[in-house]
């Protein structure tokens, strides 16, 4: 199952998302495109389980996890109701 993590420029480098990820998908790397000069990309998206704990932990709404598999998206949407 593969998920994409959308990157915004509001990262403050607090590492809350990295610590919240149960599968250690995220890691901090240098990046000039945000205030903190470092960013938490998802180099191992195949390990992402789509729990969105990183989104919940982020104080600046930096991360957005999107599911790109049709089956997985429909299943996730069904869980919301």
Swiss-Prot record:
Swiss-Prot/TrEMBL cofactor(s): [4Fe-4S] cluster
EC number: 1.97.1.12
Family matches, as InterPro entries: 4Fe4S_Fe-S-bd, 4Fe4S_Fe_S_CS, PSI_iron-sulfur_center, PSI_PsaC
Annotated residues for binding of [4Fe-4S] cluster 2: 21, 48, 51, 54
Domain 4Fe-4S ferredoxin-type, first and last residues per copy: 2-31, 39-68
GO terms assigned for molecular function: 4 iron, 4 sulfur cluster binding; electron transfer activity; metal ion binding; oxidoreductase activity
Class in the EC hierarchy, top level: oxidoreductase
Database matches in NCBIfam families: PS_I_psaC
Name of the protein in its database record: Photosystem I iron-sulfur center
Organism taxonomic ancestry: Eukaryota, Viridiplantae, Streptophyta, Embryophyta, Tracheophyta
Gene: psaC
């Amino acid at each position: 199952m593969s998920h994409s993590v959308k990157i915004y420029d509001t990262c403050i480098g607090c590492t809350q998302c990295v610590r919240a990820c149960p599968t250690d998908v995220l890691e901090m790397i240098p990046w000039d495109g945000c205030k903190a000069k470092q960013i938490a990309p998802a180099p191992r998206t195949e390990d992402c389980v789509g729990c969105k704990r990183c989104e919940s932990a982020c104080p600046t709404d930096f991360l957005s996890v999107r599911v790109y598999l049709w089956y997985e998206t429909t299943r996730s949407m069904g869980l919301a109701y």
